[in-house]
Structures are given as structure tokens and as C-alpha cells.
Amino acid sequence: MMNEDNKDFTLFKHFADKGNVYLMSGLDKSNPDYSDLVSIACHFAKQGKDVKILSPTHYKDPAYHRVFGPLIGTMYFRKCPDLLINGVFYEYESYERPFKAKKVSHMIKRGADQSERIIIDNNKGASDRYILNMIVKRISDKSFRKDIQELYVYEKGSVRRLYKKKKR
């Protein structure tokens, strides 16, 4: 399953008869989100998915075109989402301490700037109802021009989908 773009990645972890986690070259392991990203990636890999943890890359770099090529020509061109799960980009958003409930809305906004699929850090435990309310407010806001396809919540080492846009 190795193809040309995998020269930018090294295998980090293989789950027997399941998925793999790859790290992009140049990934900053001292990044505060690194351990969360690895935990999230392992969660999806255990479900049989191939997950690539991505590093920020300048859009003029040839590696950007190899890895983030599908974003060219979209509103997400020049953006660098954090994860590539089975060929689909996801953005992980955490918050700066201390946690305040209004930061959930900010995480959704920042995540939607990077990808239409977002994973937010909810280790402080905002309620599902509150998070869903924030999504509805964002979507119904006329000045918010981003599309949110899916939103996952990362809590205490586990990941669960909280929102998926209904197909019309």
C-alpha cells in the first residue's frame, strides 16, 4: 500500500490486521498537540484506517503538492490540516488553558478554517448539547462561510463522532 507520496512518511505504528499510523517527515514532536494527535491516530488505525499525522508545510514546497494536493483549488488551499485519514483531511483543535466554554465555538471556527472535518479537544467536558448548539449557531451564522461535514470529540484518550452533516 506504499505509493509515491509515502516517501514523505515513516511508519509509526502498525496494528495487526488493521490500520497504520504514519508520521510526516518534519513533524514537530515537541508540539503540545503531538501526544493527542498520536492518540487520535491510533484510535482510527485500530478501526482499520490508514492515518497520517501531517506537519505544517509551506504551500510552495513540493511536499505540499504531494501531500496536500487535493486541497489545491479549494478554499482550503494553503492550509495544513493535522490528519489524513483514509485520504480525507481532518483538523484537530485544542484550546489554551484555562478552559472556558466559549472556547468551544472558537475551536470550531478555527478548525473549519483548516478542514470541513474537525476533531476538538473536550477533555474539560463541555456537554454534547452545548457543542451541538455551537455547531448549529456556526452553521446558521450568515457570515460563517465554511462547511462542517463532521465533528469528532476527543475526550480522555477516546474519540467519538458527535455531528455528521445530513446528506440532502
Model-derived features with residue positions:
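Conserved catalytic cores of phosphodiester-cleaving nucleases, focusing on short active-site segments
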Residues: 83-94
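Metal-dependent nuclease catalytic core centered on acidic motifs
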Residues: 1-68, 74-77, 95-168
